[in-house]
Amino acid sequence: NGLDIAVDGMDEVDAELNAVKGLGGALTREKIVAMAARQFVLIGDHTKEVDDLLTTVPLPVEVLQFGAERTQQLLSNLECRPVLRTNDDGTPFVTDNGNIIYDCHFEFAPDFESLDAFLDITPGVVEHGLFLGFADDAFSFLQQTLRLTNLHRNGGAHLVQQLDEFIFIH
């Protein structure tokens, strides 16, 4: 019947709590979990908060290995530079699903709704790291401060609570 709550890390998040995730390579499974949860919470340090998505990190795009070169060409049409993610030894990084990832580097922030729609219909694309409208809350850390940022779908995010002392257990 789904999950009550899912908490996951973020690679970037904007004021509307749209996020980029997947730099660890598990973006498809992360999105499935986020969709299954009644409440989805992002967590990360304050450097993950950005004015515009895709300004500090690339967009991970999980791609089938079959036909990957053609899919890479299609991704290039997005005015980005898709780079095959590799391991330290130079071999392609393979996801838990057996796919590869292209990290798409954008020079300018794209229209995210259009990008999301395009990637959803692009042959060979399994999933992408844009999490638009998924998050309900985001926790961010600033040195020894915990800030709870809450989603306002019509007006961005605002500070709900700030704790100057807390214990972080990992």
Residue ranges and their predicted role:
Residues 1-142, 147:
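Conserved phosphate- and dinucleotide-binding cores of soluble alpha/beta proteins
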Residues 145, 152, 156-167:
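Hydrophobic, low-acid, alpha-helix-prone terminal segments
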